[in-house]
């Protein structure tokens, strides 16, 4: 009975472990392999099992000694122990049958509730043993380990009340007899076993080998034999057996890595030169139930493009590379495959075309030296030199995951002559083109056309020989399997010709792109040079349109030395230059050739592209449709705006004068005396070239006779001495329009001029683009191309030959313009009396001169404002001022208007204080002002006269002498005349001052106030005549002779001049307003504020951005909120108004209704271009402060005129403008 009780006590534990194992397997919880348990725990369990066996053996021996009854008891204990041991290794079916057998006994306890002392869970995992039986790790642990917890039995009622109710229902399937034959139970067992098998399955399905075709990488240095054959590669997926074999050596580490969330390797391989056969990567969210899912190779790892043990082949020794060969090789092969050339991998988005099969090396085979050699870095200061080799299939090692790649054999021979190879390649290409005419539309024809251009550039003649180039056909297919469901096979076929490039010329220091040397020109002086007709050529266009089309001369534009020559099929003898023998020589663009004046082409409406500058490369030199359209537009504009075209031409082109001296008739007749060119033509108002003797010109010509840069030196020297705004001899602007050339009339006219000047040496010069002086004729005389025809108002047709209307050098016009062009022309005609055929003045030049004068005057309405402030009158020489009750006024006269100041009393003593201001509108820089002092007085009617009276003294004695006493007294008498009547004019004028305003004076008072003193002179005082004074006849009084003007007082005045710089500029009325404007400007500049504002608009659109704003005067600078770096500057001078609370914008100033809703709390800045920028502050108080400050700044904008800033700077910093 005791043994049965023990068996019943063990039954709940067995059922608990069984049900717990079923629940855990159904819910697919994570399991831990027994191999992952610590070795110490395993050893302890084995020791405990051995100890239990020893106890059982001892028990048996004791049972033999005690007797039958005790032996039976021992046997039961042994059976129980053996049963327990057997349960630990029994499969699930045996345990379940045992549990069903126990169902007959009454069940007192339905479940066991454990109170764990340690929270470490116990997870079971089923393993497949060698004999095929299922073993539970939990059963082994339960039988061998001592439990570290205490158990408390609970009844079935408590289990239903406090725990999940369906637990008992699940137990009933195993404990109740009515559910013993449940058909779902075998299905459940089968599902569990199937899940165990799939979880421990180690043989994943192997992928089929992948076959794909890639295009070979183009070599860095193209050689004459370049294969464009596609490469077909077959790749096998990594074998799982190799992975398992590699993991078998480290079984414990492999088992630990199965459920690890940490990557296998701590470093990340970025160069992909690492062998990945033994690596298994598990992501953080992946499951480890399936071993196939543990294979986490990346997409590109399946192809093993970078794995393998292939050796890096060495490149052949190639000839020097030039630019032309590189251009021709860039189009030799066209990739027709779209498999790997455009596809990118899923992981790193790296094109598969970037991998080079010839450089793929495994990790175990790549050494440090090999990695350095793979970079192919040449030695410094020299080109890489590669040995000759032969590329075949045996020269490449085969990796474990890649099939052998077959290449066409390419042989490189460095001993072959370069010139012979070039001819052979050209012959092969021409023969291929002739033999395959149907391939004209293929990309090869483009290559052939490119090679044809290369042949022309290299100067190789065309050779026609038939030679068929072999064709290689490549079949490529790509097969791969996606998740075992898709099989996609693509076949591509492409014809690829074997394209051979011409060998490159050797590179010695600086390689040449042409057969001929750029810095070595052949001597062409034998090509029909005539010194008497050598022409001054300024650009290529004039050469093309002026030379005669024929075989009598050689055009420099078609010369072998010209940059614009057509590509010649026969090249000149090539010359090789080394670094030591190189000597710099300026390139000769064109040499002197025969140039006949009579062969000039008359102008027509044909397509002629002429330039006004000295550009050697004219972008319109080609006769294309676009250039014709541009030329037609230029002609149309010239016809519509003839004078504007002339004006623009004068402004755009810098005039330059030839410093050339002309020698008369014969050299022997040249005068030895020095010629004063200023005295020769000074009466003609002509400006000549700087004096230069004929000997200097002739010697310079002989020194530079064999050089073609003589003209360039003269042109450069003339540019330095050139001036703008040149005039012709008759005082008008030079006309740069061209016309027909009458050489005979020109020569006749010049001869007549020289004859009238007594055959003195006359220096002739003009603009380099206007006058053509034949340098060759300077030996015998001079020859000038000049047109004597009158120029119409319309723009004449342009011609490659340009001229001016005078043979003399022009001179800058004088400051004082002539009153009438007719009078000026008449004076010039009188000077040139000997001329029978005087040149006429160009009507276009006259019109342009008048229009320029009108333009200067109409641009600004005046020259500014002149302000005068009268301060005081000092040292007034006038008596009895108080008796005459005198008053004064100042009369101001500017020649157009007369203004009088109010009448004021004259103080008897001291200076007269004044505060009167005048404004003068300066219509010119020379203005005369008159200020007159007038006095109004009252002549006295009576005059106090001193009288001496004798007053008798009373006698003492009656008969004494009478004595008198003298007494003086003043007696009022009638005034006969007044002294002031001889000092004033009839209108009361007493003194006058004349102020001559000129440029010097304006310069002293420009943008600043100066105190000036002007003397008043009395010009009306007459001589005193006593007779006339006695009679006092007024008519006779004014007939008296006047005295010489004398100084009677001085006037102190503050003067300022504000010149006008803009027609929209506004000036105040007086100096007081000027000072007030300057004060307001200073007040505006002193406004400062800073803080954070939210901005929307301007450079911030569609959002509110917080910025740190700094206000300095009229500049609002927005800084970054964090870094405080300036980002935007807002000019508040352009702000028209500010809209804040209670003030809204209407019309164009309001953008839309949405802005009103979203930015209703913001204040807005309205600019002159109707742009609105919204601002808002962090609080209403800060917002109100910003609005007040910005409003004051905007209101002061009206005081911001151009002159205010200059006046302010002058007062503050004493800057003179």
Curated annotation (Swiss-Prot):
Source organism, top-level taxon: Eukaryota
Bias-annotated ranges (Basic and acidic residues): 470-500
Gene name as annotated: BUD4
Protein family per UniProt: Belongs to the BUD4 family.
Record localization: Bud neck
Keywords linked to the UniProt accession: Cell cycle, Cell division
Biased composition regions of type Polar residues, renumbered to the chain: 437-468
Protein's name according to its UniProt entry: Bud site selection protein 4
Organism: Kluyveromyces lactis (strain ATCC 8585 / CBS 2359 / DSM 70799 / NBRC 1267 / NRRL Y-1140 / WM37) (Yeast)
Region of interest (Disordered), ranges: 430-514
Disulfide bonds: none
Gene3D superfamilies recorded: Pleckstrin-homology domain (PH domain)/Phosphotyrosine-binding domain (PTB)
Source taxonomy: Eukaryota, Fungi, Dikarya, Ascomycota, Saccharomycotina
Domain PH span(s) in chain numbering: 1086-1195
Main subcellular location: other
Biological role stated in the UniProt entry: Required for selection of future bud sites. Cooperates with other bud site selection proteins to recognize a spatial landmark during mitosis and they subsequently become a landmark for downstream polarity establishment factors that coordinate budding and cytokinesis. Involved in the septin organization at the bud neck.
Cell cycle among keywords: yes
GO terms assigned for molecular function: GTP binding
One of the protein's GO biological processes: protein localization to bud neck
A single Gene Ontology CC term: cellular bud neck contractile ring
């Amino acid at each position: 009975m005791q043994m049965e009780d023990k068996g019943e006590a063990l039954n709940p534990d067995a059922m608990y472990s069984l049900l717990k194992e079923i629940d855990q397997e159904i819910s697919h919880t994570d399991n831990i392999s027994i191999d992952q348990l610590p070795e110490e725990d395993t050893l302890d369990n084995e020791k405990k099992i051995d100890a239990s066996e020893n106890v059982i053996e001892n028990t048996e021996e004791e049972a033999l000694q005690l007797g039958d009854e005790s032996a039976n008891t021992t046997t039961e204990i042994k059976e129980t122990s053996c049963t327990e041991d057997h349960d630990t290794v029994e499969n699930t079916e045996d345990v379940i049958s045992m549990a069903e057998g126990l169902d007959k006994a009454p069940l007192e306890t339905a479940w066991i509730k454990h109170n764990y002392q340690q929270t470490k869970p116990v997870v079971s995992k089923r393993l497949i043993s060698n004999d095929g039986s299922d073993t539970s790790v939990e059963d082994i642990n339960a039988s061998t380990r001592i439990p570290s917890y205490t158990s408390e039995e609970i009844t079935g009622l408590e289990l239903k009340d406090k725990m999940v109710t369906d637990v008992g229902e699940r137990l009933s399937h195993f404990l109740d007899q009515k559910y013993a034959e449940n058909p779902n139970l075998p299905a459940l067992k089968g599902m569990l076993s199937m899940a165990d098998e799939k979880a421990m399955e180690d043989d994943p399905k192997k992928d089929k080998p992948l076959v794909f075709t890639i295009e070979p990488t183009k070599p860095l240095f193209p050689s004459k034999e370049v294969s464009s054959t596609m490469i077909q590669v077959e790749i096998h997926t990594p074998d799982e057996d190799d992975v398992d074999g590699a993991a078998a050596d480290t079984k414990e580490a492999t088992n630990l890595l199965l459920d690890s969330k940490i990557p296998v390797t701590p470093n990340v391989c970025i160069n992909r030169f690492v062998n990945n056969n033994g690596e298994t990567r598990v992501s953080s969210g992946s499951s480890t139930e399936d071993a196939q899912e543990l294979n986490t190779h990346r997409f590109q790892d399946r192809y093993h493009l970078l794995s393998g043990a292939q050796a890096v082949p060495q490149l052949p020794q190639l000839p020097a590379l030039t630019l032309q060969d590189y251009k021709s090789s860039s189009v030799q092969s066209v990739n027709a495959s779209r498999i790997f050339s455009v596809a990118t991998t899923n992981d790193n988005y790296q094109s598969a075309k970037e991998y080079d099969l010839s450089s793929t090396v495994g990790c175990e085979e790549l050494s440090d030296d090999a990695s350095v050699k793979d970079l192919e870095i040449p030695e410094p200061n020299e080109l890489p030199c590669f040995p000759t080799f032969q590329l075949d299939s045996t020269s490449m090692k085969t990796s474990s995951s890649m099939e052998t790649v077959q290449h066409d054999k390419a042989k490189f021979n460095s001993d072959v002559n370069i010139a012979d190879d070039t001819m052979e390649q050209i012959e092969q290409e021409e023969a291929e083109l002739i033999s395959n005419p149907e391939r004209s539309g293929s990309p090869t024809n483009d290559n052939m056309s490119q090679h044809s251009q290369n042949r022309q550039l290299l100067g190789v003649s065309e050779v026609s020989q038939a030679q068929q180039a072999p064709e290689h056909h490549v079949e490529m297919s790509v097969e791969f399997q996606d998740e075992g469901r898709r099989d996609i096979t693509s076949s591509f076929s492409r014809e690829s010709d074997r394209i051979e490039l011409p060998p490159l010329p050797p590179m010695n220091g600086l390689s040449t792109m042409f057969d001929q040397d750029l810095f070595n020109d052949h001597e062409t002086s034998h090509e029909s040079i005539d010194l008497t007709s050598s022409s001054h050529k300024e650009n290529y266009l004039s050469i093309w349109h002026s030379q005669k089309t024929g075989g009598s001369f050689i055009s420099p534009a078609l010369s072998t030395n010209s940059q614009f020559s057509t590509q010649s099929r026969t090249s000149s003898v090539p010359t090789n230059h080394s670094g030591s023998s190189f000597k710099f020589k300026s390139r000769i663009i064109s040499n002197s050739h025969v140039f006949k004046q009579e062969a000039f082409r008359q102008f027509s409406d044909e397509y002629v592209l002429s330039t006004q500058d000295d550009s050697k490369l004219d972008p319109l030199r080609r006769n294309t449709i676009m250039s014709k359209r541009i030329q037609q537009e230029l002609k149309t504009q010239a016809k519509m705006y003839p004078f504007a075209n002339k004006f623009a031409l004068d402004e755009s082109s810098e005039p330059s004068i030839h410093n050339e001296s002309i020698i008369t008739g014969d050299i022997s007749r040249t005068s030895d005396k020095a010629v004063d060119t200023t005295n020769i033509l000074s009466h003609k108002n002509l400006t000549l070239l700087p004096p230069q003797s004929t000997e200097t010109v002739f010697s310079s010509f002989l020194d530079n006779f064999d050089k073609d840069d003589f003209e360039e030196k003269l042109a450069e020297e003339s540019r330095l001495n050139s001036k703008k705004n040149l005039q012709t001899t008759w005082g008008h602007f030079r006309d740069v329009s061209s016309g027909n050339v009458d050489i005979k009339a020109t020569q006749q006219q010049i001869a007549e001029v020289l004859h009238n000047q007594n055959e003195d040496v006359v220096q002739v010069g003009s603009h380099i683009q206007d006058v053509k002086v034949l340098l060759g004729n300077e030996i015998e005389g001079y020859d000038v191309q000049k047109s004597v025809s009158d120029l119409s108002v319309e723009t004449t047709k342009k011609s490659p030959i340009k001229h001016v209307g005078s043979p003399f050098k022009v001179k800058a016009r004088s400051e004082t313009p002539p009153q009438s062009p007719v009078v000026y022309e008449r004076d010039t005609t009188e000077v040139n009396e000997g001329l029978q055929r005087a040149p006429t003045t160009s009507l276009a030049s006259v019109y342009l001169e008048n229009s320029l004068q009108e333009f200067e005057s109409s641009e600004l309405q005046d020259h500014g404002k002149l302000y005068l402030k009268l301060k005081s009158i000092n040292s007034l020489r006038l008596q009895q001022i108080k008796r005459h009750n005198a008053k004064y006024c100042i009369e101001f006269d500017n020649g157009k208007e007369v203004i009088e100041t109010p009448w004021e009393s004259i103080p008897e003593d001291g200076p007269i204080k004044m505060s009167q201001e005048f404004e003068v509108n300066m219509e010119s820089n020379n203005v005369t002002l008159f200020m007159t002092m007038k006095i109004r007085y009252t002549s006295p009617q009576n005059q106090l006269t001193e009288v001496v009276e004798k007053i008798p003294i009373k006698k003492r004695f009656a008969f004494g002498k009478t004595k008198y006493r003298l007494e003086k007294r003043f007696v009022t008498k009638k005034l006969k005349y007044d002294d002031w009547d001889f000092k004033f004019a009839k209108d009361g004028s007493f003194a006058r001052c004349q102020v001559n305003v000129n440029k010097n004076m304006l310069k002293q008072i420009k943008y600043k106030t100066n105190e000036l003193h002007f003397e008043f002179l009395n010009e009306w005082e007459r001589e005193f005549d006593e007779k006339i004074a006695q009679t006092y006849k007024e008519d006779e009084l004014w007939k008296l002779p006047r005295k010489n003007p004398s100084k009677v007082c001085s006037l102190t005045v503050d003067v300022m001049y504000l010149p006008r710089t803009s027609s929209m500029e506004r000036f105040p009325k007086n100096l007081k307003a000027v000072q007030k404007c300057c004060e307001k400007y200073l007040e505006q500049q002193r406004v400062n504020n800073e803080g954070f504002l939210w901005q929307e608009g301007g450079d911030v659109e569609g959002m509110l951005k917080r910025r740190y704003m700094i206000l300095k005067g009229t500049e609002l600078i927005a800084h970054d909120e964090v870094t405080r770096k300036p980002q935007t500057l807002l000019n508040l001078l352009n702000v028209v108004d500010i809209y804040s609370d209670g003030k809204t914008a209407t019309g164009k100033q309001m953008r839309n209704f949405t802005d009103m809703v979203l930015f209703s709390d913001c204040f807005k800045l309205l600019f002159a271009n109707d742009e609105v920028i919204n601002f808002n502050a962090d609080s209403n108080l800060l917002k109100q402060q910003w609005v007040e400050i910005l409003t004051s700044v905007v209101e002061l904008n009206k005081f911001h005129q151009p002159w205010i800033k200059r006046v302010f700077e002058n007062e503050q910093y004493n800057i003179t403008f």
